[in-house]
A protein has these predicted regions:
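Short, highly charged C-terminal tails/helix-capping segments
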Residues: 50-51, 147-156
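Hydrophobic ligand-binding cavity/cleft-lining segments
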Residues: 1-54
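Hydrophobic pocket/interface hotspot
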Residues: 28-33, 39, 65, 78, ...
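Hydrophobic/aromatic beta-strand elements that line small-molecule binding cavities or substrate pockets
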Residues: 18-20, 75-80, 98-105
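Short beta-edge strand/loop motif at the mouth of beta-sheet-based domains
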Residues: 17, 37-73, 81-86
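Beta-strand/loop substructures that line and gate deep hydrophobic ligand-binding cavities in soluble
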Residues: 91-148
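Short strand-connecting beta-turns/loops that link adjacent beta-strands
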Residues: 25, 70-72, 83-84, 94-95, ...
Length: 156
């Protein structure tokens, strides 16, 4: 995972990691993951995805988007975009965060998906004990939902 210097896991107040095996090719998983405008249709912890820079519905390098997740509205910018392997964006709102995704082929036509997030700022520093398990649960929902849709076919 490519981490921005300010979000190295060892130097962050909150760090969460989730992983799942998906019986779908990395390219298909990638297409679902970058189609951010459609996240609310299959990932219940996202809403109101609006692009302020970029070409909806898909993320691309330097795309900026505002969205609601975990009950908070955040502004994000894509800073890592390496199809179909790695995607990452920062997030700013009541905290600063970096959320990265890694898609690794499994050699059998499927892939392993790893998602990691680091958070910094006053809120994560004070509430790390609450935020970490919340992120892990929310991101587990995300990877399980990604598995379900990707194994079902390509996005429309």
């Amino acid at each position: 995972m490519k981490w921005p210097a300010e979000f190295e896991p060892d130097n962050s107040s909150v760090y969460a990691r989730n992983e799942i095996a998906i019986a779908a090719p990395p390219e298909r998983v990638w297409r679902w993951l970058i189609r951010a405008a459609k996240w609310p249709e299959w990932y219940s912890n996202s809403a109101n995805v609006n692009f302020s820079r970029g070409n909806p519905p898909d993320l691309a390098p330097d795309t900026e988007f505002r969205w609601k997740t975990f009950g908070a509205t955040v502004l994000s910018r894509v800073i890592v975009f390496e199809p179909p392997r790695e995607l990452g964006w920062d997030a700013h709102g009541m905290l600063s965060a970096y959320h990265g995704w890694l898609i690794e082929p499994d050699g059998g036509g499927g892939c392993r998906v790893i998602t990691e997030e680091c958070q910094n700022g006053l809120v994560p520093k004070l509430a790390w004990w609450y935020l970490r398990p919340m992120l892990e649960r929310g991101h587990q929902n995300w990877v399980e939902s990604l598995k379900r849709v990707a194994e079902g076919g390509d996005p429309s």
